[in-house]
Amino acid sequence: MNDNPANAEPQEEEVSLESQPSTPESGSDGSKEAELEAKIKELEDSYLRVHADFENTKKRLEREKFQALEYAYEKIAKDLLPIVDTLEIALKSANEVSGEESELQAKFKEGLELTLDNFSKVLQRHGIEMIACEGEFDPHLHECIMQVPSPSHQEGEIVQVFQKGYRYKERVLRPAMVSIAKSN
């Protein structure tokens, strides 16, 4: 026998039946099982809800990403619209000059027309369209800034356009500012 306790072999302990946990009685066994099944069902439901929330969030983020890419030109288009307005005003002013038109004025007007035409083509190529302003007033596309009596128009019809409106795909970038006819 070895006197060194570090090298000593572990001795087997005898385990009596009294130290073993007692088996549950048959009545409480059924309730414990039902309790565990209820807990499993609760955890499964919780898992399904969390998984559904995750999938919905994933789909929403994918949709938002697609829309962000789809409408990427919207901000720059809004910034370009005042430039188009300024070119149109300059062309209108050049056309209203009275008197004899010099060759320089004619070339200037031609340059403005070409610039405005190119601008319009670029906007159209990128899906930016001018809002039509004929006929009936549409509050989704037009902004009424005044009502005027007009014997040649029916009530609610657009009489005059003060500023053109534009849309990018389905979204209105800027509503058209118009006056509409009112009844006398």
UniProtKB/Swiss-Prot annotation:
Gene Ontology terms, MF aspect: adenyl-nucleotide exchange factor activity; protein homodimerization activity; protein-folding chaperone binding; unfolded protein binding
Q: How does it assemble?
A: Homodimer.
CDD domains linked to this entry: GrpE
Instruction: Provide the species name.
Output: Wolinella succinogenes (strain ATCC 29543 / DSM 1740 / CCUG 13145 / JCM 31913 / LMG 7466 / NCTC 11488 / FDC 602W)
Q: Which family does it belong to?
A: Belongs to the GrpE family.
Tell me the Gene Ontology biological-process terms attached to this UniProt entry.
Answer: protein folding
Name the gene behind this protein: grpE
Know the name of this protein? Protein GrpE
Localisation per UniProt entry: Cytoplasm
Composition bias (Polar residues) maps to 17-29
Q: Does the keyword Cytoplasm apply?
A: yes
Q: Which domain of life is it from?
A: Bacteria
Function, as annotated: Participates actively in the response to hyperosmotic and heat shock by preventing the aggregation of stress-denatured proteins, in association with DnaK and GrpE. It is the nucleotide exchange factor for DnaK and may function as a thermosensor. Unfolded proteins bind initially to DnaJ; upon interaction with the DnaJ-bound protein, DnaK hydrolyzes its bound ATP, resulting in the formation of a stable complex. GrpE releases ADP from DnaK; ATP binding to DnaK triggers the release of the substrate protein, thus completing the reaction cycle.
Could you tell me which Pfam families the record lists for this protein? GrpE (PF01025)
Q: Where is this region: Disordered?
A: 1-35
Q: Which UniProt keywords apply?
A: Chaperone, Cytoplasm, Stress response
Q: Which GO terms describe its cellular component?
A: cytosol
